[in-house]
């Protein structure tokens, strides 16, 4: 099985107006590109990235190769997704079987929001609850105090609601992260933290595991 053609399909997925206004401090895009990987066997694999299509040189590097050439590869994961899709279809297996043991049988769905003022954060949580969501992931940045945001959420969220923060490494290191994370773990609605410090700081992650109760994980 060889990849013979890659078709980029550019989509425009707009934010709701209130989110767009709150997201001015991020250089984000409403453009999403879906890739269809065609093969000489007729199978089609699907990949995706946020933003415009990758350049033709990168896409061309996949042409003429087998999807199996990209197992645990060093290419763009957005494109390797399509290769795993193809491998799973070719073998008649779910793609996770090519990656290791199954961890869970389901994946939680949640609301998403950029970092906002505590007042707007509370209002956004109420929108999420009204639409049936019981959890959300919020970008956490220095624009607003994440502790104040969390207290605002705690005041309006139903008892079973959960919030997880995505810092994208913005707490930098353990010394800066620990005081903030220790305050967050006192707030019941906070259930998880994504990449509080830089991913390569192995010793820092080990120390967080020793000292922090809140679950945390890589981006």
PLM ranges: what are they?
Residues 105-120, 139-140, 168-174, 217-219:
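Active-site mouth loops of central-metabolism enzymes
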Residues 116-128, 174-182:
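Short, acidic/polar
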Residues 133-135, 189-190:
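A structural motif
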């Amino acid at each position: 099985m060889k990849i013979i053609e890659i078709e980029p399909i550019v989509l425009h997925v707009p934010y709701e107006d209130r989110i767009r206004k709150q997201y001015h401090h991020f250089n984000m895009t409403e453009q999403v590109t879906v890739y269809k990987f065609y093969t000489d066997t007729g199978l089609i694999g699907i990949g995706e990235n946020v933003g415009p299509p990758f350049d033709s040189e990168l896409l061309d590097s996949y042409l003429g190769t087998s999807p199996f050439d990209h197992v645990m590869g060093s290419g763009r994961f957005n494109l390797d997704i399509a290769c795993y899709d193809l491998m799973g279809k070719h073998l008649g297996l779910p793609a996770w079987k090519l990656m290791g043991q199954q961890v869970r049988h389901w994946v939680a769905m949640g609301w998403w929001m950029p970092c906002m003022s505590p007042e707007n954060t509370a209002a956004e949580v109420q929108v999420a609850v009204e639409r049936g969501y019981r959890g959300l992931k919020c970008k956490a940045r220095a624009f607003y105090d994440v502790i104040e945001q969390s207290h605002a959420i705690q005041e309006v969220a139903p008892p079973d609601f959960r919030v997880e923060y995505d810092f994208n490494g913005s707490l930098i290191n353990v010394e800066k992260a620990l005081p903030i994370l220790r305050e967050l773990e006192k707030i019941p609605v906070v259930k998880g933290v994504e990449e509080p410090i830089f991913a390569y700081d192995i010793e820092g992650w080990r120390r967080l595991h020793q000292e922090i109760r809140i679950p945390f994980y890589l981006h």
